[in-house]
Amino acid sequence: MDPAVSPASTDPLDTHASGAGAAPIPVCPTPERYFYTSQCPDINHLRSLSILNRWLETELVFVGDEEDVSKLSEGELGFYRFLFAFLSAADDLVTENLGGLSGLFEQKDILHYYVEQECIEVVHSRVYNIIQLVLFHNNDQARRAYVARTINHPAIRVKVDWLEARVRECDSIPEKFILMILIEGVFFAASFAAIAYLRTNNLLRVTCQSNDLISRDEAVHTTASCYIYNNYLGGHAKPEAARVYRLFREAVDIEIGFIRSQAPTDSSILSPGALAAIENYVRFSADRLLGLIHMQPLYSAPAPDASFPLSLMSTDKHTNFFECRSTSYAGAVVNDL
């Protein structure tokens, strides 16, 4: 034995081990602390689904998209630059305001699931970096200057300010999960849909492909939050139904205002009809999320019709005709974003 290591410090289960910063082991820990056993089959299924559908930014080649950027009008280019500036920053928005929720749980299924979610969020961040550079013709200096100007745009600030205010007044763990559901399930919905409309013009095909993959990942993340809210917050009082409906209504109003305020006024990609369909989709998404947490719909919004570009994103193994690589998604989680 190395004389520099005391016998007490060699046993990670020794409750008498000492050392600066050492966390005491509970006197009567549950046996599951020391080995894996499945305790959350629904969350374990989502982890397995995430692993089965792992992907990397290196699998996507954006050369054709770089050529398509010149086909966008000035208003369209500005709009999509704005959306991707928001989406790129949104992961930090979630982490800064609602991070650490995984630390509330001892079930290894939940902890293991969050590891997978964090891994794929890294891929999303890297993909958004690539897409931003594509939209700026690989001019990183111009991209940086644009993001610095845009990150405090009123349309983005209203989302940030709303979230920060709701977090400050939030006094329960279940309500924080409602906020997480709304960020990933409502605050991204209009952006994902607007990006998907590029497909209808056969533009930025790989960007559309990555949007499909990211949207499907976020559908899994939102479903996981709903499952945790439903099944694994015992001992925590859930917010009253009126409070939940109020939060949903506020989030939907903000998201619809976000897309209305930024959409180009003269676009062959986003017609008035397309914008109306996106707004309906935001309401439909909210209703679906309410259903996942066993609540009645707020809007009774109809499902998007077959022409809606995100209709290709159900997880029934649809493959986009325009895509070089199939974005078929194994499993049965329905995209509700």
Curated annotation (Swiss-Prot):
The keyword Transmembrane applies. Fe cation 1 binds at residues 91, 121, 124. Coiled coil: none annotated. SUPFAM superfamilies: Ferritin-like. It holds the Pfam family Ribonuc_red_sm. Its cofactor is Fe cation. PANTHER family: RIBONUCLEOSIDE-DIPHOSPHATE REDUCTASE SMALL CHAIN, RIBONUCLEOSIDE-DIPHOSPHATE REDUCTASE SUBUNIT M2. The keyword Iron applies. GO terms for molecular function: metal ion binding; ribonucleoside-diphosphate reductase activity, thioredoxin disulfide as acceptor. GO terms for biological process: deoxyribonucleotide biosynthetic process; DNA replication; release from viral latency. It is an enzyme of class 1 (oxidoreductase). Fe cation 2 binds at residues 121, 184, 218, 221. It is a single-pass membrane protein. The gene is RIR2. The lineage of its organism: Viruses, Duplodnaviria, Heunggongvirae, Peploviricota, Herviviricetes. Its EC number is 1.17.4.1. The active site is at residue 128. InterPro entries: Ferritin-like_SF (IPR009078), HSV_RIR2 (IPR034715), RNR-like (IPR012348), RNR_small (IPR033909), RNR_small_AS (IPR030475), RNR_small_fam (IPR000358). This is Ribonucleoside-diphosphate reductase small subunit. GO terms for cellular component: host cell membrane; membrane. Ribonucleoside-diphosphate reductase holoenzyme provides the precursors necessary for viral DNA synthesis. Allows virus growth in non-dividing cells, as well as reactivation from latency in infected hosts. Catalyzes the biosynthesis of deoxyribonucleotides from the corresponding ribonucleotides. It catalyses: a 2'-deoxyribonucleoside 5'-diphosphate + [thioredoxin]-disulfide + H2O = a ribonucleoside 5'-diphosphate + [thioredoxin]-dithiol.
